Amino acid sequence: MKASHNITILLTASLLFISCKPKVVDVKPDEPTDPEKHETITLGGGCYWCVEAVFQQLDGVISATSGFMGGHIPNPSSEEIYSQTSGHVEVVQVVFDPDKISTPEILKWFWKAHNPTDPEGQGVDKGSIYMSHIFAHSPKQRELAETSKKEAQTNFDTPIVTTIRDAEEFYAAKEEDQDYYFRKKGENPYCPQQITPKLKKLGLDY
């Protein structure tokens, strides 16, 4: 779903070094090539640059689009999102081929790709916008998410705080924030400081 505004956030150089705070945008998520076959799940696991860099590498994933979901204000401005008044969460909308990678497999990567027990956000990115969420696109997917969460809990000493909700309207991030890590890892120190170690730990390309 397209956002109906075009807001530019001015980021200071120091903010780029330590946090993930981009802009809201008019970019529609990549359309599945076969809507009858492909499925969609929307995941929030901290800064969407990080989550996107993980899922776009997985075999069977058709597209991974950064954006926002879960708020109570339609067509939110950047100020409303990042002041945490709109209720939106940074997410990555993942379109995948279930014949190549299943929903439970997608979710296993999700649990490994972030710390779902952190109630304050992820790493240096703190606040409700960076908290752990799964937005299910069907009742079956929500059931699978609940089961996966219970299974994942056995790997953590503290409670998983991930919220599981039905998918809502998706607002894609600006084009400049899509495929961010692999385009900007040599320019923005946030990438080698925060994203590269995660990709190395997961055995993915970096």
Predicted stretch roles:
Residues 20-206:
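Flexible coil/turn and secondary-structure edge motifs
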Residues 1-27:
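Bacterial Sec-dependent N-terminal signal peptides
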